[in-house]
Amino acid sequence: MAALKALVSGCGRLLRGLLAGPAATSWSRLPARGFREVVETQEGKTTIIEGRITATPKESPNPPNPSGQCPICRWNLKHKYNYDDVLLLSQFIRPHGGMLPRKITGLCQEEHRKIEECVKMAHRAGLLPNHRPRLPEGVVPKSKPQLNRYLTRWAPGSVKPIYKKGPRWNRVRMPVGSPLLRDNVCYSRTPWKLYH
């Protein structure tokens, strides 16, 4: 009964707002964008706290390359980001950590794949701790068992690093990072090392 009453009162409020026009209802107007300042004024025993719009924000800056086909190309960021640029990556992921589709982000195929790889690497490095699926209420996560990823009969705790991987001319190198990011700009004197 209470739900029906709330539904009827909500519909009545909606109809009154539509019939009265946008001037009468505050929710039908678009909110003004701008910086607000909290102002406290006291009149006798009443304190009035209001937010006044102080200054309108400037228009968004024009991209340096407006003819680019995706946002990364338009802002000339094609080979200039990595997995540790979390502010850039967080614009292309959902709140639970998954990638947004290309239709929404507007990225080209190449940049979408690179952003996806960077998001994976950032998750593995623990740089996106707040972007993971929420557990249901009251569920305590179990501790994950340490699996033997080395597929050997010895315990993973007994594994020691191989300090000598062979002579320098015949050394067995280990791939590091992603081959998708090999064209990134290197700001140091030494070139990128994709194999360590």
Swiss-Prot record:
It is found in: Mitochondrion. One of its GO terms (molecular function) is structural constituent of ribosome. GO terms for biological process: mitochondrial translation; translation. SUPFAM superfamilies: Ribosomal protein S18 (SSF46911). Residues 1-34 form a transit peptide. It holds the Pfam family Ribosomal_S18. Keywords: Mitochondrion, Ribonucleoprotein, Ribosomal protein, Transit peptide. Its main location: mitochondrion. The keyword Transit peptide applies. InterPro entries: Ribosomal_bS18, Ribosomal_bS18_sf. Component of the mitochondrial large ribosomal subunit (mt-LSU). Mature mammalian 55S mitochondrial ribosomes consist of a small (28S) and a large (39S) subunit. The 28S small subunit contains a 12S ribosomal RNA (12S mt-rRNA) and 30 different proteins. The 39S large subunit contains a 16S rRNA (16S mt-rRNA), a copy of mitochondrial valine transfer RNA (mt-tRNA(Val)), which plays an integral structural role, and 52 different proteins. mL66 forms a zinc-binding site with uL10m. Belongs to the bacterial ribosomal protein bS18 family. Mitochondrion-specific ribosomal protein mL66 subfamily. There are 3 mitochondrial isoforms of bS18 in mammalia, localizing to 3 distinct sites in the mitoribosome. bS18m (bs18c) binds to the same site as bacterial bS18, mS40 (bS18b) binds to a novel location of the 28S small subunit, and mL66 (bS18a, this protein) binds to the 39S large subunit. PANTHER family: 30S RIBOSOMAL PROTEIN S18, LARGE RIBOSOMAL SUBUNIT PROTEIN ML66. This is Large ribosomal subunit protein mL66. The gene is MRPS18A.
